[in-house]
Amino acid sequence: ITALTRPDAKQGALIGLGSGLTSHALLASDRLESLTTIEIEPEMAVAARHFTPVNDRVFKDDRSRLIYDDAKAYFAGIDARYDYIVSVPSNPWVSGVSSLFTVEFYQEVKRYIAPGGVLAQWIQGYEISDRLLMTVFAALDREFADYRVYRVGSRDYLIVARPDDGEPSKLGPLDAGLFASADMREQGELLGVADVSQLEAMLIANRKMLHPFLATHPANQDARPYLDDGAERDRFFRASAEMLLALR
């Protein structure tokens, strides 16, 4: 979805290696010249190699670059901008992760998005309450001029957001032309996606719908770390965010 939102992207960055499948999928775009994947734990790359060949591009594609560093520290030390930044950190109850869902982080990360670029933020809707989940949405709502919310799993969400950078801030349609390329089609088939319309059907909300509610909702901040304070509790009580499930 991120690649099809910004089909002309040349430079991309991803926060969080995980299994390597997201990086592999992004590298399916033949228009992308470089993808930097930032992972704080080097052992994740060791584990990810067990998933070959379905993530081969991460380790074998010359356009792929793995950086072992804290995401905030990495961005603070570079002078570069990316056509998109995809943030797929661990679950918010993992120590330190909640700081990647704050107003301050979104303020900072915007500096590294090229004009016309986007941020794609993944967050899960399981083991988290509606109240806490909406603190993340409210933080992002404060800092981005437009965004779309896609339901990408039974309880997983991808928020694709555009900052107000002087360029037209409205998000355009997903690009069917890029999806038609051989590697992208193959990647789609692995995920059970045969057509862009299937991805468009995952769209459940946008800023116009959510802003009136989020404008008055508490936002997750460094000084008011609602997510850090409540994520472990929500996990313990097996909380589940239900509000967005009603948006179809």
Residue positions per predicted region:
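The AdoMet/dcAdoMet-binding core of the Class I SAM-like
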Residues: 1-137, 141-143, 153
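Soluble small-group transferase modules, centered on the S-adenosyl donor enzyme superfamily
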Residues: 1-14, 56, 70-79, 98, ...
